[in-house]
From Swiss-Prot:
It is a single-pass membrane protein. Belongs to the membrane fusion protein (MFP) (TC 8.A.1) family. Its main location: membrane. The gene is aaeA. Forms an efflux pump with AaeB. One of its GO terms (molecular function) is transmembrane transporter activity. Keywords: Cell inner membrane, Cell membrane, Membrane, Transmembrane, Transmembrane helix, Transport. This is p-hydroxybenzoic acid efflux pump subunit AaeA. It holds the Pfam family CusB_dom_1. GO terms for cellular component: plasma membrane. It is found in: Cell inner membrane.
Length: 310
């Protein structure tokens, strides 16, 4: 009898332990797979592609690659003598037409004052027409001068904001054309994280929810807040034909892969360029409040580590 009772008790304890282990593993699995998190996340920042508005030889480069610069700091200079001469020529044209316009203005005024008693209507109209033509030429000369002055100012390529110069591809003596990208500027204090979450996990993601960001290869966790969720993603199965009609590919796959939706996360504190734009991270959306890891069980902590390093 005692042996039977002992066997039953042993079996019951074993079954209970197996059930508890199964429940714990199942909850950890659900926590790992169903909760909103992703390893497909990247640090990003506002990046300005800097291109000159004038063409010419680069006469001076004032910065180095990956240097931190301030707003309006001169990055490099394009051949200025040519644009200085163009401005001087434009200013000479303005001075010439100003003098000519003054002469024609006096002449037209004199003829209009004398009137048709002293000369013909045709001569009066001719003087007025010449004055209008010269004033038009003066306006064009002023516009050309202003444009030449603007071109001269833009021979100095300046930083549009505080940030880091990166991918600097300009050298003294090199010819650069207008509109060709010469350098990229990563704006300071504009870093954020773009997390690509599966559509099956979006139910637990809302703007304002808290997030934990763990950079790849780092044990440091950064706090952030969900800023926005993308309103749409590209449909790879659909396109338009030559007549503009929708063309949908046949899709009978047995396995349906969840689409990934971009979620923008605002960092609580800017980290400088400690994690450059484009580097990867793991993101966990913790809900309306930050996660209290002290209450997590062993399996949940194991899942957290798998997320960060798995």
């Amino acid at each position: 009898m005692k042996t039977l009772t002992r066997n039953i008790l042993r079996t019951a304890i074993t079954v209970i332990l197996v059930i508890l282990a199964f429940v714990a593993i199942f909850r950890a699995w659900v926590y790992y797979t169903a909760s909103p998190w992703t390893r497909d996340a990247r640090f990003s920042a506002d990046i300005v592609a800097i291109a000159p508005d004038v063409s010419g030889l680069i006469s001076q480069v004032n910065v180095k690659d990956n240097q931190l610069v301030k707003k309006d700091q001169v990055l490099f200079v394009i051949d200025q003598p040519r644009y200085q001469k163009a401005l001087a020529e434009a200013e000479a044209d303005v001075a010439y037409y100003q003098t000519l316009a003054q002469e024609k203005r006096v002449e037209a005024g004199r003829r209009n004052k004398l009137g048709i008693q002293a000369m013909s209507r045709e001569e009066i109209d001719q003087a007025n027409n010449v004055l209008q033509t010269v004033e038009h030429q003066l306006a064009k000369a002023v516009a050309s001068r202003d444009l030449a002055r603007l071109d001269l100012e833009r021979t100095e390529i300046r930083a549009p904001a505080d940030g880091w110069v990166t991918n600097l591809n300009v050298y003294t003596g090199e010819f650069i054309t207008r509109g060709s990208t010469a350098v990229a500027l990563v704006k300071e204090n504009t870093f954020y994280v773009m997390a690509y979450l599966e559509e099956t996990k979006l139910e637990g993601v809302r703007p304002g929810y808290r997030a934990e960001i763990t950079p790849l290869g780092s044990s440091k966790t950064i706090k952030g807040t969900v800023d926005s969720i993308a309103a749409g993603v590209t449909n790879a199965s659909s396109s338009s034909d030559s007549k503009g009609m929708a063309s949908v590919d046949s899709n009978l796959e047995w396995v349906r892969l969840a689409q990934r939706v971009p979620v923008r996360i605002r960092l609580d504190q800017q980290q400088g360029n400690l994690w450059p734009s484009g580097t990867t991270a793991t993101v966990v959306i913790t809900g309306k409040e930050d996660r209290d890891t002290s209450r997590a069980n062993f399996f949940q902590k194991l899942a957290m580590r798998l997320r960060e390093f798995g």
